[in-house]
Amino acid sequence: MSTIIDVYAREVLDSRGNPTVEVEVYTESGAFGRAIVPSGASTGEHEAVELRDGDKSRYLGKGVVNAVNNVNEIIAPEIAGFDVTDQAGIDRAMIELDGTPNKGKLGANAILGVSMAVAHAAADFVGLPLYRYLGGFNAKQLPTPMMNIINGGSHADNNVDFQEFMILPVGAPTFKESIRMGAEVFHALKAVLHDKGLNTAVGDEGGFAPNLGSNREALEVIIEAIEKAGYKAGENVFLGMDVASSEFYNKETGKYDLAGEGRTGLTSAEMVDFYEELCKDFPIISIEDGLDENDWDGHKLLTERIGDKVQLVGDDLFVTNTQKLAEGIEKGISNSILIKVNQIGTLTETFEAIEMAKRAGYTAVVSHRSGETEDATIADIAVATNAGQIKTGSMSRTDRIAKYNQLLRIEDELGEIAVYDGIKSFYNIKR
């Protein structure tokens, strides 16, 4: 047993230059843990509360001094004396201390920072890598990466409506080879865009953010890049999209406005028709948040139409929340959940969501946020839970590469017992 003797938080910066919370946990044994909390740009309205100061004279109101103070002055005294390996007990104590359904009092960014730092300190205490400490001996599956190589929507300053266009190197034999394939397609895409006279600047998640004429054109240039890199789309590499449709859903009209394509006032059924058409024309294996987070009828229709052959991921739809996920499972909506630790605010609740998804035959995709840091905890979480898939950005920006590099280290450490399932990680659809 090693008890917690001190918890300390500070304000640091994320990849967008905005403040976020870093937490350190100290124990009587000398074991130590540190973690930094990520932040999202497009957020679901049902997410746990990210506490910001709102003081416009500091960081344009985005400071997190209040969250930091909540850790140092309220949470730290409460969990001092806890056994550092009592993750569930510590998380439960913080949830009760907050006392709100959405962690709105202390802030999910305060609570999560402590939750993750505790796990790191516990792993340090028992002398195990984080993935092994959290997942035990069965933690050995490397995730199939979903690489966001074209950014649009709220992640980029361009006229592409959909937020992310991804490549999934499912044909690779190992995680290491999947990274190589992804990097080669990324560099091929840069050349394709350059030759077309398009911008090769990158967005928040490291993908390119060119001013393309339509969402379809984004898919077309990616296909061209896959072929230029020497691979076959629909065989070695598949495509994925995070539509983030809540960002262009008009709540007043109840319709969808694809401004970049000059198409406005689309109904849910028309959006479903559009996705079905795209899936016929391109090897799309995954669509995230195809309809607004509150358009459950639309999600149901999408699931009925293409859910047998396309992974339909709920991000804003489920917000890593077991209550929302249970409702979706009961109603037969989507077939996958995106897992973002800061949407729910503790590791314990994160693992509960992953387990619930798996029991129901849903896939689970561990995900970064658009505002990231050098913290690579989610890489260990993906392996610890054998989630099978990870979404952590493109092949550029250190805040994204940090996760890939950690996964490469884990694969190397696992050696012959490492598993990379590739296409088999999409176990609930027919391909």
UniProtKB/Swiss-Prot annotation:
Which protein are we looking at? Enolase
Q: What Enzyme Commission number(s) apply to this enzyme?
A: 4.2.1.11
SMART domains to which the protein is assigned, alphabetical: Enolase_C, Enolase_N
- Top EC group: lyase
Catalytic reactions of this protein? (2R)-2-phosphoglycerate = phosphoenolpyruvate + H2O
Query: What residues sit in the active site?
Result: 205, 340
Q: Which Gene3D superfamilies match?
A: Enolase-like C-terminal domain, Enolase-like, N-terminal domain
Species lineage, top-down?
Bacteria, Bacillati, Bacillota, Bacilli, Bacillales
Cofactor binding: number and manner: Binds a second Mg(2+) ion via substrate during catalysis.
Q: What does this protein do?
A: Catalyzes the reversible conversion of 2-phosphoglycerate (2-PG) into phosphoenolpyruvate (PEP). It is essential for the degradation of carbohydrates via glycolysis.
**One GO biological process term:** glycolytic process
Give binding positions for (2R)-2-phosphoglycerate.
163, 340, 369-370, 391
Binding-site residues for Mg(2+), renumbered to this chain: 242, 288, 315
Q: Name one GO molecular function term.
A: magnesium ion binding
Instruction: Write out the annotated subcellular location.
Output: Cytoplasm; Secreted; Cell surface
Pathways per UniProt: Carbohydrate degradation; glycolysis; pyruvate from D-glyceraldehyde 3-phosphate: step 4/5
In which organism is this protein found?
A: Bacillus cereus (strain G9842)
Similarity remark: Belongs to the enolase family.
List the cofactors: Mg(2+)
Question: What InterPro entries does the record point to?
Answer: Enolase, Enolase-like_C_sf, Enolase-like_N, Enolase_C, Enolase_CS, Enolase_N
**Family annotation (PANTHER family):** ENOLASE
NCBIfam families per UniProt: eno
**Could you name the Gene Ontology cellular component terms for this entry?**
cell surface; extracellular region; phosphopyruvate hydratase complex
Keywords (A to Z) from UniProt = Cytoplasm, Glycolysis, Lyase, Magnesium, Metal-binding, Secreted
Q: Which SUPFAM superfamilies match?
A: Enolase C-terminal domain-like, Enolase N-terminal domain-like
